Amino acid sequence: MIQMQSVLDVADNTGARSVMCIKVLGGSHRRYAGVGDIIKVSIKDAAPRGRVKKGDVYNAVVVRTAKGVRRPDGSLVRFDGNAAVLLNNKLEPIGTRIFGPVTRELRTEKFMKIVSLAPEVL
């Protein structure tokens, strides 16, 4: 469950290390984002020679949450932390690699590229 001011790890090779959620997209008063939701983020920590720099604003998709995802069979998939993948304005991933597992809930038309790049799909 991600809200404004939440700090997330970055699960791709864009050079960003951590980002802060500045807006949850979708709806005028939407408060929380879960796995598969798109958020606006600001880069808070970045590698020196990465594609992005501190202070830049990007779209991102949430790929892991500590809150977890409830499946129809009743099981719950939870992670140790919150992570996101940076997207461009066309909602395509900026990075060419994804680090760590992602959930099966991302297997929609929009995010198949992220699922195919991920080393593990839970």
UniProtKB/Swiss-Prot annotation:
- What InterPro entries is this protein classified in? Ribosomal_uL14 (IPR000218), Ribosomal_uL14_bac-type (IPR005745), Ribosomal_uL14_CS (IPR019972), Ribosomal_uL14_sf (IPR036853)
Q: Which SMART domains match?
A: Ribosomal_L14
Per UniProt, the keywords (alphabetical) are: Ribonucleoprotein, Ribosomal protein, RNA-binding, rRNA-binding
UniProt keyword Transmembrane, yes or no: no
Question: SUPFAM superfamilies annotated for this entry?
Answer: Ribosomal protein L14
Task: Report a single Gene Ontology molecular function.
Answer: structural constituent of ribosome
Which one GO biological process term can you cite for this protein? translation
Q: Does the keyword Zinc apply?
A: no
Give the record's GO CC terms.
Answer: cytosolic large ribosomal subunit
Q: Which Pfam family name is an example for this entry?
A: Ribosomal_L14
Signal peptide annotation: none
Origin: domain of life: Bacteria
Question: What does the function comment of this entry state?
Answer: Binds to 23S rRNA. Forms part of two intersubunit bridges in the 70S ribosome.
Q: Which HAMAP family match?
A: Ribosomal_uL14 (MF_01367)
> Which family does this protein fall into?
Belongs to the universal ribosomal protein uL14 family.
Subunit info here reads: Part of the 50S ribosomal subunit. Forms a cluster with proteins L3 and L19. In the 70S ribosome, L14 and L19 interact and together make contacts with the 16S rRNA in bridges B5 and B8.
Its recorded name reads: Large ribosomal subunit protein uL14
Species this chain originates from: Thiobacillus denitrificans (strain ATCC 25259 / T1)
Q: Which gene encodes it?
A: rplN
